[in-house]
């Protein structure tokens, strides 16, 4: 097992940037919302697993993140399995934007499952699709080595994800990726994580808005309760965002957190990202 200084140095070197895209194989062709760097990062992250536990992908959309994780895992030399969670539904607008080569469905809330199954077919024996509202899902699958979160679009759902999935992380081994961590319209993510700073160590900012963390201590119920964000007042939410700015000083520009504070001020009481974005409109 690597010690923490070695893991910090490993991520600081950003070795995923040296991964040739050809190494991703068929995963490189799967439609995705990921940035080019995120695509390489997920593949590299899968490839570096130690066999400590499952890989969990929260917020899969058309399978882009799962495919890149799977392409890396397949090269790891370890047994592997990805649990991918989503409603697996899409609006026509998102479909047209991210899958322009696919026939446009006639209505919104279109079924993505046939496409996802096709996209992940090369690894079909190594992936389980969990269909439905993540807010109603429970994790009972044992230790998690990689937890990718692209689903905490509201404060209440962020709390649910933490309660259900964070306790399965293995200190010293497990990597948590908060893919939307620095989005100005999701300030509850940094507000939650800063109160869990005794349990997580920031490893790397993966542009545009992702942050990777190392689990360094077990997640207790008391810690999760203290970190909860669903019922925070605007004032307390802003206070935690300021704490997070100090925590991430040197890794993330202060302007990122200033933008979050401006969103909270502009949209009092709003705790859903799409509502902030819509109101900002």
What are the roles of these predicted feature ranges?
Residues 8-11, 25-28, 47-281:
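S-adenosylmethionine/decaboxylated-SAM
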